[in-house]
């Protein structure tokens, strides 16, 4: 008779193979977890914080332009509706404010009154489809001195920053073959609600940037992003010194930003996380200071006695900069630094930079300057420095 293995022996072989297979799977999972852990630890996580309309989302767009593949033609075309909405919101807001300002503003040309009626009566409809006459009325109104005077008083009501930019470009945007350029994409205003993550790589270093809505009712979501953050990039609109919040017309926007920065700086969960401070919208700040219509001292009396520091720190003073503009931007910088130096615990630091988020070269230079700072923060985070 032939020899046959016993049932017990066969079962033992099967169990042995199962055990080996399970071990191989376990080892593979362990290796993958180790790789994931290494990748996680090698990734710089940047949290963009700041009050609403400070320019955070524009910074994210710049990262896409500089470090990803920018925006495809199809993505650009998808922004056309948002850009048209920016034009509609701008002309609706400006013409609507003419009668509510104190003192009110009258149209220069009486024949433009039907145009205003059209804008207010029809363009305000949610299903408005932007017929050719809308652009014609908008272009003619934008030439009216009364409308322009109302625009110049935009700190007295709520108007998007990109209003002038897009109203100046109506003749281009109304073209059926129009495709937005990068500057159009950068300036297009869309309210950020929720948390948006952008991933990119610079010199083989991985970055994850989280953009969170800055309006008051969005800030409760911030706590979800605080875990394992390498650094916070706090963005403030320096040009907002003469403006009030959309959600609270009694609160100055720049003071709100200072209060928000203080609450983040002193947050007990963030006491070891340094902040890179983007003092944004320097172009708009310079325009306002040079125009002289809204003096910084009228909103911040401390500015009257402020002297520009001899040591200008990390910013480059251009030879053609207006001395009053220089004094204004350093005053705002020092208001934030006064908060960051008050604690003096040495556990985290504030690194200020003057920025113009719609200027790609400026953001490229500033972010390159920040990379070494971010790397040091990352090494310190994992106790490698």
Curated annotation (Swiss-Prot):
Record region (G1 motif): 45-58
Region (G2 motif), start-end ranges: 184-192
Region (G3 motif): 207-216
Binding site for Mg(2+): 57, 192
GO MF term (any one): GTP binding
Biased composition (Polar residues): 1-14
SMART domains, per database record: G_alpha (SM00275)
Residue stretches of biased makeup (Basic and acidic residues): 17-31
Superkingdom of this protein's organism: Eukaryota
Sequence segments annotated as region (G4 motif): 276-283
PANTHER family: G PROTEIN ALPHA S SUBUNIT (PTHR10218:SF212), GTP-BINDING PROTEIN ALPHA SUBUNIT (PTHR10218)
Job description of the protein: Guanine nucleotide-binding proteins (G proteins) are involved as modulators or transducers in various transmembrane signaling systems. The G(s) protein is involved in hormonal regulation of adenylate cyclase: it activates the cyclase.
Family: Belongs to the G-alpha family. G(s) subfamily.
Subunit structure: G proteins are composed of 3 units; alpha, beta and gamma. The alpha chain contains the guanine nucleotide binding site.
Name of the protein described by the UniProt record: G protein alpha s subunit
Organism: Drosophila melanogaster (Fruit fly)
Taxonomic placement: Eukaryota, Metazoa, Ecdysozoa, Arthropoda, Hexapoda
């Amino acid at each position: 008779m032939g020899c046959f293995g016993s049932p017990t022996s066969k079962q033992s072989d099967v169990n042995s193979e199962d055990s080996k297979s399970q071990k191989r799977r376990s080892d593979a999972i362990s290796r993958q977890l180790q790789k994931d852990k290494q990748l996680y630890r090698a990734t710089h996580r940047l949290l963009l914080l700041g009050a609403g309309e400070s320019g955070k989302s524009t910074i994210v767009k710049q990262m896409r332009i500089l470090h990803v593949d920018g925006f495809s033609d199809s993505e650009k075309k998808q922004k056309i509706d948002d850009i048209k909405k920016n034009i509609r919101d701008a002309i609706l807001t400006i013409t609507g404010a003419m009668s509510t300002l104190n003192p009110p503003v009258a149209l220069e040309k009486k024949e433009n009154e039907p145009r205003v009626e059209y804008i207010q009566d029809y363009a305000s409809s949610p299903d408005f489809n932007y017929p050719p006459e809308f652009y014609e009325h908008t272009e003619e109104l934008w030439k009216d001195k009364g409308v322009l005077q109302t625009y110049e008083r935009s700190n007295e009501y709520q108007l998007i920053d990109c209003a002038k930019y897009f109203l100046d470009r109506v003749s281009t945007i109304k073209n059926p073959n129009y495709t937005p350029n990068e500057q159009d994409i950068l300036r297009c205003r869309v309210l950020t609600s929720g948390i948006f993550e952008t991933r990119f790589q610079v010199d083989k270093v991985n970055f994850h940037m989280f953009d969170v809505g800055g309006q008051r009712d969005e800030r409760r979501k911030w706590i979800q992003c605080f875990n394992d953050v390498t650094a916070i990039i706090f963005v403030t609109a320096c040009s907002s010194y003469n403006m009030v919040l959309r959600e609270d017309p009694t609160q100055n926007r720049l003071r709100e930003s200072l209060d928000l920065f203080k609450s983040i700086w002193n947050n007990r969960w963030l006491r070891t996380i340094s902040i890179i401070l983007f003092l944004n919208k320097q172009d708009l700040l310079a325009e306002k200071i040079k125009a002289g219509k809204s003096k910084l001292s009228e909103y911040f009396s401390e500015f009257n006695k402020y002297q520009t520091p001899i040591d200008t720190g990390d910013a480059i003073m251009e030879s053609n900069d207006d001395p009053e503009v220089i004094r204004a931007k350093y005053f705002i910088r020092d208001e934030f630094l006064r908060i960051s130096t008050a604690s003096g615990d040495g556990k985290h630091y504030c690194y200020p930079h003057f920025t113009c988020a719609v200027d790609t070269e400026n953001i490229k230079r500033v972010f390159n300057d920040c990379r070494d700072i971010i790397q040091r923060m990352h090494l310190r985070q994992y106790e490698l420095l």
